[in-house]
C-alpha cells in the first residue's frame, strides 16, 4: 500500500497540492492550451500548455464548500420543507436557481487576499469557512441600507455560484485557455455549470466523461496513477504546479506479510490514454 503522497512534495518546497496536475498534464497533453477544472469543496485548475510549456496548477477559490454551508443552513432553518436525512448540499442547484445574485456581496468576498496571490498556490476549507462568509455578510449589512436588505439563503447561494464561476473564468482567461474540461461534484450542479459556461464564453466547457474519466471518479484515477508512478520509481509531482523545487517520487510504501520487492524504475511517462477497460476497472489507466 502507498500512502502519505503529499509529504515529499512539501519537503521539497511545494504546497503538496494540487496533485491532480500530474494526471491532467498527461491526460490533456496536446497541441492546444487546455485547462482541467475540478470542482470539489475547492475549485482548482491545471493549465496544460503546448509542448515545452510549463504546467501551471492552483486552487482558484471556493467550489462547493460555501454552497454546502448555505444549503445546510437553508435546510435547518425550514425543517418542514426538508425530510429527515436531506443532504447538506444544493441538490441540482435548486436553491441557487431560486435566488438572485446580490450585487454588493461578490466584491466583499473577493477582497480576500488569496484571490490576488500569484500561483503556485493552494487553499482549503480552513480559509473559506462559514466564518469567511459570515464576515462578508456582516460587512454587507454595515453598508448604508444593508441591514434592511439581508440576502435570503437562495440569494446567497446564487451569489456563491457567481463567485465560483467568476474566479474560475478569470483564471482561464488569464492563461489563454482554448478549452476547459470539468470534473468533480460541482459538474453535477446544472446552475453552477451554466454559470461557468457563461463566465468562460466563448471557451467551451466539456465534461471529463467525454474524455474517458467520469466526473465523480477523477480522484480515483489520480490515486491509481500516482500509486503506479511511485511503484515504478517515477516522479508524481510537477514542480511548476505545486511549487516544489524538484520532481519527487511520492509516498511511502507499507509492505504486506512478505518483503517489499520494488520493480526496476521505468522510463518516463509522457501521455495518458484512458481505455474502456481501464474505466471498467475504476481507474487503472494505460500510460504510454
Q: What is the predicted role of each segment?
A:
Residues 28-34, 74-86, 173-175, 228-238:
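Short helix-capping/linker segments at secondary-structure and domain boundaries
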Residues 105, 156, 160, 171, ...:
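Non-transmembrane, aqueous-exposed alpha-helical and coiled segments at domain scale
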Residues 177-199:
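Glycine-rich phosphate-binding loops at beta-strand->alpha-helix junctions
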